[in-house]
Amino acid sequence: FACDDSGGSLRDISNDVTSLSVNVAQALIDITGLDKSAMERLVGLGDGSFSVSGVFNAASNKSHDVFKTRTGTRTVSYAIGGNTSTNPILTMECLVDSYNLAHSADGALTWTAGLQLQSGTTPTWSTV
């Protein structure tokens, strides 16, 4: 998992990530007329988001550096199985909508971040 920092440099933070959820959605537009007995729909706009969780890492160019400043567009890349040829990869231009820290009684410091599609370009899977 890699994400641009606020300066636009892509940073591989996969070592800090413990959980990741990807949502690639398609809006459906209801066009059902009163004369129908079932729904009619058209394909609407695509959307995408990431929900990411991890272990806090304050080292240079790691997760805290990437998410501590939430402004600006971020290129986000998720390659299933790593950056090995033919592995699936999803890349989107996103905005960071949240960066939250949690400190538990056992001393663990963890974070969650939400990233939402920004560019108006439909998210599509390709290969590394």
Name what the model sees in each region:
Residues 43-44, 72-78, 101, 116-119:
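Short, surface-exposed linear patches
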Residues 55-60, 119-122:
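Acidic glycine-/aspartate-rich tracts in secreted/extracellular proteins
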Residues 109-128:
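Protruding loop/beta-arch "assembly-hinge" segments enriched in small, turn-prone residues
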